Amino acid sequence: MSSAVKLADRYLMTKRLGDGTFGEVMLAKKIDTGDRVAIKRMKKKFYSWEEAMSLREVKSLKKLNHPNIIKLREVIRENDILYFVFEFMQENLYELMKDRDRYFPESVIRNIIYQVLQGLAFMHKNGFFHRDMKPENIMCNGTELVKIADFGLAREIRSKPPYTDYVSTRWYRAPEILLRSTSYNSPIDMWALGCIMAELYILRPLFPGTSEMDQLFKIISILGTPNKDEWPEGYQLASAMNFRFQQVVATPMEQVVNTISKEGMKLMMDMMLWNPEKRPNANQSLRYKYFQVAEKLGAPVVSQPAPGSIRKTSAASVKSDTKAMTAKAAKKDYIGSENVSPQQPAKVIDRHINRNLPLNKETLFEKSDNKPLGPTKSNEAKPTAKEIYLSKSKYVPGQVSKDTHQNQIMTTNGLTGTTKTTTFSAKKEGRTAVQTRFEYAYGYIPSFGARQTGPTVSNQTNNHSANNSHSPNKMSNTGRVDWAAKYVK
């Protein structure tokens, strides 16, 4: 780790791989050896080495040297800009899943989960937990080698709470975090891995919530309402934020993840127990029967691709998988989740899997018949599932837009046929405590905090005021509960 070495003297930047909140990542080649590396350029400026070395990511990665944890090769500070030089991996787990045209064999999923657990066990043993486990933060060289990456949110287990409550991507966020706990610990990594494990089987997120409250509702709709005796702390957290658990019967997980073995189901469900204290830790998880199989598990001996090797893309990986499955099917000794006829080799379809389909009987609850996932209508380049998902409108009835200062609401009086257009002007900042709590509990901001301006009434009649009993500050919206009126009583 040095500030005297110039980046341009040692590395040749080739292309941009991605951009995040804290920095951008570039693909580069080491000039003297030809090795490919990933260089993360931090957006924040660092004016001393002491400041740079105090970063959580540096502190954790300096202590964590493991085959299933991404290796930090060096740190370079140049012109007050900090560069992290990491070993290069071909892709992340999300990219590996979205390029699939068929389900993974369970043996492949088992090996991926085994390697992630090995990395987590080492991390937790050395006093750190990740806090942001998700498919994008698990780097891959095909399905053979996986490594945990992005330790920007990592925490020391022995550090004292309270912690910041906004951690981890929502779809993989543990319920204690959704309920605003500030004393969580390493079990949140186990919950996230349980969600990732389910996603590897069904190739779409298990709990794709659109907000924090919707995330909780989606978890409850599948796992059922937690028992108060089973998790009393959860009910205390819910009460503190004015949230009430809906009484819902659990959906049989066999209907949701229907290609998993009994041993895999046991591990996955235990990692997603409501009570964090009852979830197995990483070491305990590695001793489950799911991993007691007659096959080699773990990282291969060679973890870094040869300097001059050509990157094997996900599409190429799918083609290789198809060829191998066809050959094995011809010998009648292949056991897996794919069913390929030796007379008609499986055709690899360049398609994009919609991993964000709703969880219903037409998508997940159907029984798997081991068929490929099917083609799309076009081979044109398509946006990723996450881009499609995030681009959709997140309109919630009654919500005041964060991007506009004025909203118009049209209401119709059913008795007179008159139409009233009301313009509300609301500030982005300075929400009342009532509005804030309401947003936490229900996922939208009630309109009673907005200032009403310029009401206009069309088609007025003489008997309009007699038939319309609404006050000027109330709105008629058929089919909706007037939460505002209830709240201000």
Swiss-Prot record:
Residues 366-385, 452-489 are annotated as: Disordered. InterPro entries: Kinase-like_dom_sf, MAP_kinase, Prot_kinase_dom, Protein_kinase_ATP_BS, Ser/Thr_kinase_AS. GO terms for biological process: cilium assembly; intracellular signal transduction; intraciliary anterograde transport; intraciliary transport; negative regulation of non-motile cilium assembly; non-motile cilium assembly; positive regulation of non-motile cilium assembly; protein localization. ATP binds at L17, G18, D19, G20, T21, F22, G23, E24, V25, K40. The keyword Metal-binding applies. Residues 11-291 form the Protein kinase domain. Pfam families: Pkinase (PF00069). Residues 458-473 have a biased composition (Low complexity). It catalyses: L-seryl-[protein] + ATP = O-phospho-L-seryl-[protein] + ADP + H(+); L-threonyl-[protein] + ATP = O-phospho-L-threonyl-[protein] + ADP + H(+). It is an enzyme of class 2 (transferase). The active site is at D132 (proton acceptor). Expressed in head neurons including amphid and labial sensory neurons and 3 pairs of neurons in the tail including phasmid sensory neurons. In male, expressed in the tail including the sensory rays and the spicule. Belongs to the protein kinase superfamily. CMGC Ser/Thr protein kinase family. RCK subfamily. Serine/threonine-protein kinase which is required for ciliogenesis. Regulates the length and the morphology of sensory neuron cilia. In addition, plays a role in the anterograde intraflagellar transport (IFT) in the cilia by regulating the undocking of kinesin-II motor complex (composed of klp-11, klp-20 and kap-1) before reaching the distal segment and the docking of kinesin motor osm-3 onto IFT cargos. This is Serine/threonine-protein kinase dyf-5. It comes from Caenorhabditis elegans. The lineage of its organism: Eukaryota, Metazoa, Ecdysozoa, Nematoda, Chromadorea.
